[in-house]
Amino acid sequence: MANIVYFSSVSENTHRFVQKLELPAIRIPLKDRIRVEEPYVLILPTYGGGHANGPDPDRGGYVPKQVIAFLNDEHNRSLIRGVIAAGNTNFGAEFGYAGVVVSRKCDVPFLYRFELMGTTDDVFAVRAGLQDFWKDQSCPQPSQLQNR
C-alpha cells in the first residue's frame, strides 16, 4: 500500500488533503521528531512565496523547518521515494516550490503539486498516481537483477 508522510501547519490545509486521499499516512508533528521504517512519498506545503526575483533555491524558507529536521535524519531521508507539494498559485513560479527543493536535495521525483487543500480532481489524480508510482517502485530495476 502507498505510504505517505506529510506535514501540515496549523492551517491544516495539507492535513485535509491527505485525509481526502483515504490512504495510510503518518504526520510529521509540529514539535516532536519521528522516524519512519518504510519507503514513503512526502507531501508538504510550500512556505515563503512572493520573492521579487522569483524562486531562489539557495535562499531557503520554502520547506517547513519540521520537514527539514525530519529529512536531516539520514534514515528518514534514505526512505523517501517522491514528493508532492501544496502551494498557492498567487506566488507564480514559486507555486509548490518546496517540492522542487526537496526533489533536488533528495534526488527523488517531484510527482505533483496542488493548490491549498486541493480539488476533487487533485485527490483522484494523486490517488491514481500513487497507485501507479508504487506499482513501478515494486518492479525490480535492472540494477537489482543479477546476471545469470
From Swiss-Prot:
One of its GO terms (biological process) is protein modification process. It comes from the Bacteria. Coiled coil: none annotated. One of its GO terms (molecular function) is FMN binding. InterPro entries: Flavoprotein-like_sf, RNR_Ib_NrdI_bac, RNR_NrdI. Belongs to the NrdI family. NCBIfam families: nrdI. This is Protein NrdI. The lineage of its organism: Bacteria, Bacillati, Actinomycetota, Actinomycetes, Mycobacteriales.
